[in-house]
Amino acid sequence: MNLEVVDNFLPRDKHLKAFGFVKNAPARWGEYDDLPEKPAGSSIHIKKEDQIFQYFDKVARDRFNQLNDPGFDLVRMYVNVFWPHECPRWHIDAHPIEGLESYTVLYYPHLDWDRNDGGFTHFWRTDHTIGHFPMPNRAICFDGTIWHTATA
């Protein structure tokens, strides 16, 4: 399993701007992981024409070499919004297709974090999980076909 972690993903001013964006954007209930009939939280969908979409695409390509293929397109950007005690489900972000690569980039825009806040991301292995803390301004890039889940 290849998980690439980058701390201090955005410059400080852009990190603060990203935090302000997600803090003030309207979230909608109904985001689901694997089963549409079992929503796991809310989300903020970001449009391709939004400046933040274009900026994040550029920075992700600069920071993660596997995204530098000129034919590779960012197809969806959204913000997960979980409230305490919500139960995200195990899921994959893309179904495996031979000859087609798919990547997910998780970004944590919050300004501070305490271990009792939760918010960990777990990645499935055969007999265990690998967990990552949601450190502020951290990004994780991984194969979109890897099973993963968050904790609220």
What are these regions (language model features)?
Residues 54, 58-152:
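Catalytic core of non-heme Fe(II) oxygenases with the double-stranded beta-helix
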